Amino acid sequence: MARAVGIDLGTTNSVVAVLEGGDPVVVANSEGSRTTPSVVAFARNGEVLVGQPAKNQAVTNVDRTIRSVKRHMGGDWSIEIDDKKYTAPEISARVLMKLKRDAEAYLGEDIADAVITVPAYFNDAQRQATKDAGQIAGLNVLRIVNEPTAAALAYGLDKGEKEQTILVFDLGGGTFDVSLLEIGEGVVEVRATSGDNHLGGDDWDDRVVEWLVDKFKGTSGIDLTKDKMAMQRLREAAEKAKIELSSSQSTSINLPYITVDADKNPLFLDEQLTRAEFQRITQDLLDRTRKPFQSVIADTGISVSDIDHVVLVGGSTRMPAVTELVKELTGGKEPNKGVNPDEVVAVGAALQAGVLKGEVKDVLLLDVTPLSLGIETKGGVMTKLIERNTTIPTKRSETFTTADDNQPSVQIQVYQGEREIAAHNKLLGSFELTGIPPAPRGVPQIEVTFDIDANGIVHVTAKDKGTGKENTIRIQEGSGLSKDEIDRMIKDAEAHAAEDHKRREEADVRNQAETLVYQTEKFVKEQREAEGGSKVPEDTLNKVDAAVAEAKSALAGTDIAAIKSAMEKLGEESQALGQAIYEATQADAAAAGAPGGQPGGAEPGADDVVDAEVVDDDQESK
């Protein structure tokens, strides 16, 4: 029997896990990491980079690097690169293909089946788009499972026979969910779920970026938001600072050569961010997690004291302020520390894959639909057929009638949401039931049936009880992809798989070389165009030019050894260039501080004292 994997397709990072001898194992990727950045980049030579290699080159390839695409799933978002349009499911499929390859390399066999997780609060269109991404990646998606449910499954299977109530607080890179589950005797039942599909760690990063932009503008007068490359560097620095502040009270954010001033002099960003300041600028984001928590407690009608365990999911829950808020909301209950928040969802997905494949016995997973489903009736009212937090799979029917005399057809508009007015909810799709015999209004009987499968995907049927005529819609328009488009994308992905594998081997070296060439050329150009002439001798610049030309020549070919050699030489020349810039800057500063032409350094000054200390340190270290 072919193996099945569990995949946590995340906004920021993704994880793949598999069952080995009945136990879930998180698979390390080809770079040796257990998490893979959900980043896809299109290099200018046509190569597609996924994961860490894509993230590494983002600074020099901003417009062709896509991250956090999960936030666009189910919408009409697309990006055009080299005259080709890519949809969100297509980009997500690239991440899934890498996870599939890495798992196949680990297992030594092909993988066809997968369970993929989604945020509990994902609507029908977003779920369908995720399933489409799996198909494009060459995977048979056995089941779409809610992330908190997968986490509870991973957490709860070894907790014995006693029934327990578990609260899962899931704050990821781009989405937030709270779910309340009951676990006991091999049954995992979701009682209620709530959340926010546009709240996650990315938003905390954005606040730090805004803070840095304001600080830099205040000191230099330059607005970095107009510089795409600078903004990419700020984003990476913000994420790093956020992570560091989870374990320390302050962090330094130091970005050399972030931009240049009007005189082409390089400028540096150097700021100190404390945990207190970080929490101050992100407090409103934290407060947005309160309402979904309260909603889940209200929907289930339980008391906070009835919660037995609190499980934190998602890397963003490592922030101390988040942990403290969860403790406050749960009446001082200490969150469970026995699970890895980055991996627990993929582990649960692998277990569910095992259940569906028959490898894991005596486990029943009862999930719920996160939002109410219904149709628009007279007056634009939303008439709900399936209430939110109903256990799935489920099927509900209700009989409606016509609003006008001799009405020959009815338009069925399917909505998802909690608002009383249909138009304020999410329109999932619409279809028409025709051929209704002429009759006074209120006489025809139209039975509308909603059927939600275990993936949370909706099928709606309308049937005229008088004639037996019926029409059915499977809600899939939300993904924006037809079956033909999905088939085309699958073939396209398969055709490029071998080519991608060949290119991947040289990707890291090539990215590093391209980055070095770009940065070096930029600074050489700035020096030559500087007012008052370059601060660096022309022969130094010429040597750098020659090294750049050699590196470009190597990059034009496919010899990795030649690229490495040229990169090392360019690195040496770049260091010489940097040293010359610093020496010239120091000489200018010394001349400015020594009026009357006195030789700088004729008297021992503060600089000499620092030099002496450095020498002493070196001697002591020897």
UniProtKB/Swiss-Prot annotation:
Q: Which residues, renumbered to this chain, carry the PTM Phosphothreonine?
A: 175
Which keywords fit this entry according to its UniProt record? ATP-binding, Chaperone, Nucleotide-binding, Phosphoprotein, Stress response
Annotated region described as Disordered, given as residue ranges:
589-609
> From start to end residue, where is composition biased (Gly residues)?
594-603
Q: What does the record note about the induction of this protein?
A: By stress conditions e.g. heat shock.
InterPro entries on file: ATPase_NBD, Chaperone_DnaK, Heat_shock_70_CS, HSP70_C_sf, HSP70_peptide-bd_sf, Hsp_70_fam
**Gene Ontology molecular-function annotations:** ATP binding; ATP-dependent protein folding chaperone; unfolded protein binding
NCBIfam families documented for this protein? PRK00290.1, prok_dnaK
Q: What does this protein do?
A: Acts as a chaperone.
The record's similarity note reads: Belongs to the heat shock protein 70 family.
Protein name as annotated? Chaperone protein DnaK
* Protein source organism: Mycobacterium marinum (strain ATCC BAA-535 / M)
* Record lineage: Bacteria, Bacillati, Actinomycetota, Actinomycetes, Mycobacteriales
Gene label: dnaK
